[in-house]
Amino acid sequence: MKSYEFRLVFDVLAAELSDEDLDAFYEAGGGDALFGQSAGVFDADFTREAADILEAVVSAINVIETAGVGAVVVRVEPDDQVSIGDIAERTGRTNESVRLLVNGQRGPGGFPMPATRVGTGRSRLWRWADVVEWFHEYEPDRWDEESTRYWSVLALVNEFLRQRAFACRVDETAVQVRHALSPALERHCAV
């Protein structure tokens, strides 16, 4: 068993967590979490013992969602979306070094494409799981399989949580989008 640290951000109907809510989380198995709230956002910082990161995160999600307080997990942190500055900080490089890797002016090339652009389109964000996978190939001595899997699991769990929220929508637009994209999803998953 290893110890894994992560934060679950969750939504709950109440304006704040009561002592009874905290007791319910504890009784559901959340004794290894520190619960907090800031600006209407609820979170739980877990230090969870488990065989692997997936087991740790899934068991923690189950604690939050089965405690009987109406909580629904919306994401796991640390966040998978990173800027050049975040990549530099997490890899121990300078911003300029990362920029050169991103632009293919240093390293082997093939740096992952940005996942999105924010603001006026100048600020790019990458999926950290993709970046770690690239670094694992580029610098295998610094990035082992376990850290690569850790970030991949967190990214996939977050994607599942986003998809779950979308799948629960029943308005006409959501139904039309799901129906229209189903063939594309089937083609993509068949590859």
Regions found by a protein language model. Name each.
Residues 68-80:
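Short, amphipathic alpha-helical "recognition" segments used to contact nucleic acids or chromatin
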Residues 11-33:
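Short amphipathic alpha-helix segments
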Residues 31-67:
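Short, intrinsically disordered low-complexity segments
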Residues 58, 100, 133:
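DNA-binding alpha-helical recognition surfaces that contact promoter or target DNA
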Residues 93-123:
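Major-groove DNA-recognition helix of helix-turn-helix-type DNA-binding domains
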Residues 1-14:
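Short glycine-/aliphatic-rich beta-strand segments at the starts of folded cytosolic domains
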Residues 77-103:
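Polyanion-binding surface elements
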Residues 128-185:
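A short, Lys/Arg-enriched interface patch at domain edges and termini
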